Amino acid sequence: SSSIDLSIALFASWGTPARVVGYRGTQAKIRRSDPTYYLGILNPRIAHVMCATEDIKQQLARFISPDRMTVSPKPYEVMWMEDVWAHPKSVAGIPSTAFQVICLANTKGRSFKGLRILIRALELLTDTDIHLIYLGEYDKADYKLAQNGPAAKQIHMLGPHKDAVYYLPGKDVCICPSTRDASPRSLREAMACKVACIVTDIPGARDLVVDGRTGIIVQAVSPQAIAEGIRVLAADRAKTKMMGEAGYQRIRTDYTMEEYVRRLKGVFDAIMTK
């Protein structure tokens, strides 16, 4: 729930026996001195809080008792990608032999998403046949950086696309270069498309990837580390493909809607018996 939705639920249930369960999917700062937080996530009337990641629970533990929180990662069903598999999209101008890295993120006004760092990483790979496909909103300054830099021919800035996920099938790597993030949906989508993942070592995103098995985890805020990670996977395409297959099995078995509903029902049952 958003802060506004949670506040509305608290006001609407005032004076009723209804129990309010909150959801926290971000590591955004919480200020105890700011009274508006007590209209939402810090309100003592909240019976329980569902946290998207363990790191979020640890952050909230400064304000909320751990026994009032449950970690429940967002689910993803591979069947949601059936139409994507049936109608994949490609990018014109990229050689069929190229190693294709894709990034799905809206970075306009959000420098923490790491697009500029990723562009700098590609500039360290101009001696390769590695191409970056970027889909999402971006700042003009980042576009100019990409188009005026030494890797311009290897960077394809496609902008926002409602059908962005249709570009995932057949790509070699999906990358999340963020300096902070929660638990990116794009990584789940990539895993459901059997695409290996490279993520920065930040809370939330790193939980999705098993380092060395479904992808690799690299140092954050480091174009050099990102470039080296891409180079390593490009040098062993067979292993990269195996990582994509392993990621598919992980998302298919560990992030099911059935398991998510089971955890949620367990929380509801426990609250109602108190």
Feature roles, as predicted:
Residues 14, 20-47, 63:
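A conserved, positively charged/aromatic
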Residues 196-199, 209:
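Short hydrophobic beta-strand element within catalytic cores of glycosyltransferases
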Residues 1-6, 24:
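Short His-centered aromatic/hydrophobic patch
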Residues 225, 232, 239-254, 260-266:
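A short, well-ordered alpha-helix in the C-terminal region of glycosyltransferases
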Residues 160, 179:
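Aromatic "clamp/platform" in nucleotide-sugar-dependent glycosyltransferases that forms part
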